[in-house]
């Protein structure tokens, strides 16, 4: 839940700073540092700060009572602040401070932000966002054309969670994390150093900051199909403990037919991509603390049961009716391939395509119980 409260002037309104920064500080404001806190959340705070000395950045800390719960630097580029710098009105940068431990929702308003060296806390924006959402991160995975868009849309609507569509961000950070992991037994000294000093955490913290910044909340839905995202799921557990993973799967005949209608392209490439996604999921799911698998056809034919399965898994049983209703009434793009078109001999494929399908998809089909 996000609420707004009213505080001091100097706000970002409609993408601009209003009133224009660079004015003489008013009574009660620091003559050295200007800034605003714009978001308070259970896992991060964000805003902007300005040190009136060109070339310097403000160091910012968040406190709850006597405890420092977040620390960092205001060094993020933002268009409105960049324009103010170019015009010589204000030397300001944005900041986002993540917390090591979540803050209780009832304590969020008690978080105060300070610029190092300044006694007064950073003022709050008039349109301050207070995000008391429970830490609910839902990752919807699967092969393309398996119903991930339908479920992603349903979850964001029924649970009122932010969703940016297909993010494809986690694989980027996961690859960086793997590169920074290092190896304590390596001959190369730098590689050993990376492992010894836990440089992997740099990528973990970067991913957390990016997800919070993009969604403006500690809770969100990320619907991204494909093998790279499936492979990144264990990394996401590192970034967001307690995350929920929902894997969508679809009969391979219906999936391949839908791919060909939607994307065209090479038949065998679609077969390989489906098989790769399913094989990668078989590997990855053993590394996750928990997950749930949903058959795309069941979302269409048994929405009430699927709604209960999902809400029991995420711990919000009261949302079952909203999810069921959305699954029944909200239909995203459909290719016309049909959930029931599952006989490869009746799919309109050539004999060579049927043989290629059996060769490529057969092992994964049998592993998941498709005849």
Task: For every predicted segment, state its role.
Residues 173, 254-258, 335:
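Short acidic/His/Gly/Ser-rich catalytic and metal-binding motifs that mark active-site loops
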Residues 178, 214-321:
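PAPS-dependent sulfotransferase catalytic domain
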Residues 184-192, 266-273, 340-347:
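A polyampholytic, Gly/Pro-enriched intrinsically disordered region
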Residues 3-134:
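Basic, ligand-binding patches in group-transfer machinery
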Residues 1-26, 111-113, 117, 127-129, ...:
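PAPS-dependent sulfotransferases, especially Golgi type II membrane carbohydrate sulfotransferases
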Residues 113, 127-204:
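PAPS-dependent sulfotransferase catalytic core
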Residues 32, 197-207, 279, 286:
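Catalytic alpha-helical scaffold of carbohydrate-active enzymes acting on polysaccharides/glycoconjugates
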């Amino acid at each position: 839940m996000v609420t707004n409260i009213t505080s001091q002037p100097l706000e970002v309104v409609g993408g601009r700073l209003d009133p224009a920064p660079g004015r003489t500080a008013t009574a009660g404001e620091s003559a050295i540092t200007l800034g605003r806190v714009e978001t308070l959340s259970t896992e991060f705070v964000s805003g902007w700060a300005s040190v009136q000395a060109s070339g310097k950045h403000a160091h910012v800390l968040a406190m709850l009572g006597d405890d420092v719960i977040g620390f960092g630097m205001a060094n993020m580029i933002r268009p409105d602040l960049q324009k103010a710098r170019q015009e010589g009105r204000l030397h300001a940068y944005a900041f986002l401070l993540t917390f090591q431990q979540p803050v209780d929702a009832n304590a969020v308003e008690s978080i105060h932000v300070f610029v190092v060296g300044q006694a007064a806390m950073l003022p709050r924006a008039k349109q301050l966002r207070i995000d008391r959402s429970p830490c609910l991160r839902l990752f919807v995975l699967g092969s393309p054309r398996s119903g991930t868009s339908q479920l992603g849309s349903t979850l964001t609507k029924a649970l009122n969670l932010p969703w940016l569509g297909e993010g494809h961000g986690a694989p980027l950070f996961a690859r960086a994390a793997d590169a920074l992991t290092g190896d304590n037994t390596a001959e190369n000294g730098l590689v050993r150093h990376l492992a010894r000093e836990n440089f992997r955490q740099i990528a973990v913290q970067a991913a957390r900051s990016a997800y919070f910044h993009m969604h403006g909340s500690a809770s969100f839905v990320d619907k991204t199909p494909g093998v790279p995202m499936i492979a990144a799921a264990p990394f996401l557990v590192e970034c967001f403990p307690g995350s929920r993973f929902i894997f969508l799967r679809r009969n391979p005949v219906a999936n391949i037919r839908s791919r060909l209608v939607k994307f065209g392209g090479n038949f065998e490439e679609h077969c390989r991509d489906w098989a790769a996604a399913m094989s990668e999921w078989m590997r990855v799911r053993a590394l996750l603390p928990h997950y749930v698998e949903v058959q795309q056809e069941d979302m269409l034919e048994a929405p009430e049961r699927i709604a209960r399965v999902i809400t029991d898994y995420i711990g919000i049983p009261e949302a079952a009716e909203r999810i069921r209703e959305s699954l029944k009434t909200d239909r995203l793009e459909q290719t016309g391939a049909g959930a029931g078109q599952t006989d490869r001999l009746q799919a309109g494929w050539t004999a060579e395509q049927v043989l290629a399908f059996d060769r490529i998809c057969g092992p994964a089909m049998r592993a998941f119980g498709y005849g």
